[in-house]
Amino acid sequence: PRSTQGLSSAASDVYKRQNLEFKKKYNSKILGSHADRNRIPGIDILLEENQKHKIGNLEFEVIFIPGHTKGHIAFFFKKEKIAFTGDTLFSLGCGRVFEGTHEEMFNSLNKIKNLPPDTKIYCGHEYTNSNLNFCLKYDPKNTHLKDKKINIEKKLNSNQPTIPSTIADEIKTNIF
């Protein structure tokens, strides 16, 4: 099956370019934040906070999470227990505050934190190993973090991805 819709979480230059390439290559619709309607070229379907949308048999809810960018959104697939958090929450870290405020970022991270603990987190970038070293520097006695380091090293040595993480794991190990 081919992709008929692409999800866009933020108005970053990389994502803007990728959205247009995806749209052209797959003749697909792009879904993005209503707040970014004038900033992301090619958005066909505008999404707002708490809105539910279906792609095939999959339904997701839109979570408005400004901070990294003004119109940043996440996609929460409740039935599948999966959240795509873009550049707001990473495994063991969080995105930079480029356009929003630190208060917005803090509130957005708390929204994500309140998802069910077993929710799998898929982030926009893979910075897990460098984020791990940062967290260990500031929380060196965290036994959960030490265990996660062993797990991450095993995965990396086996050429396995370190993503997804879970909400429960991030609460125990992510200093943000």
Where are these regions (language model features)?
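Short, small-residue-biased leader/transition segments that mark boundaries at the very start
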Residues: P1-Y15
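Metal-dependent catalytic neighborhoods of phosphoester/phosphodiester hydrolases
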Residues: K16-K25, G42-I43
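A short helix->loop->beta-strand "cap" motif at the edges of active sites that frequently abuts
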Residues: Y26-S28, T119
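Short internal beta-strands
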Residues: S28-A35
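Catalytic core of the metallo-beta-lactamase
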Residues: I40-D139
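Accessory terminal helices/loops
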Residues: N110-K120, N129-F176
